Amino acid sequence: LHLCDRRQRQMCIRDSIKTGLLVPLLSLLFVGVLMVMAINPPLGRFNAWLSIQLDGMQGGSRLVLGTLLGGMMATDYGGPINKAAYVSGTLALVDQQYDLMAAVMAGGMIPPLGIGLACLLFPTRFTSTERCSAPQTLLMGATFVTEGALPFALRDPLRVSLACIAGSALAGFITILLGCGCPAPHGGLFLLPVMENPPGFLIALAVGTLTTALLLGMLKKPLKH
């Protein structure tokens, strides 16, 4: 019996070392090698190309780009399209192109904010669980955590995605139109003190959030109880 207990403890120790140390370490090494060998070179070339393109973009073309980046942030809620838009915004920060980061941040905040507001305005369109999560969803939106919209999108992907993309694209457009700028890659409303034209950014958020909420109210039908 004691021998069995000792073997079980040894197996537990080995398993804990394997899962707590070896697997994370090997995963980190793999990702590091992958970044250095496969991802960084093309990303560096993309960075150089993007810098050249941004230098030549003025007026209407920047409005289009801001709209596109805002909409991309709401396309897959933290997936590859979302991350591509986010990387574009962070790369623009290197050249002090703060307006695009503002469009990206506004676009990423709109889905949770719009869904949270829709839960409050149109409670019959959502389940009791979704309504209870509305405050948390609003908080995630305020802090630029786009993934807060994911549970709602999984339940009703078409309607939620259409509403979120429309609101986010509109918010991205307005941030460029009003000359907003964001000098940091993350933070949401906590970055308002360091933003360029904070009132304009709040206007973009308000319009985008309301657009998404109203579209959800129109697209989603009341649930049958």
Question: Where would I find each of the regions flagged by the language model?
Answer:
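Single conserved hydrophobic/aromatic residue that forms the stacking wall/gate
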Residues: 1-13
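Hydrophobic core segments of alpha-helical transmembrane domains in multi-pass membrane transport
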Residues: 6-7, 24-36, 69-74, 107-118, ...
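Hydrophobic alpha-helical segments of integral membrane proteins
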Residues: 10, 14-21, 42-57, 71, ...
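Membrane-interfacial loop-to-helix junctions in multi-pass transporters
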Residues: 17-24, 54-66, 96-100, 196-203
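Short helix-coil transition sites and intra-membrane helix breaks within transmembrane domains
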Residues: 37-43, 74-83, 103, 140-143
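Hydrophobic alpha-helical transmembrane segments of multi-pass integral membrane proteins
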Residues: 62-98, 102
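Transmembrane alpha-helical segments and their short flanking loops
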Residues: 87-95, 131, 139, 143-145, ...
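Membrane-embedded helical hairpins/re-entrant loop segments and their flanking transmembrane helices
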Residues: 104, 111-143, 153-158
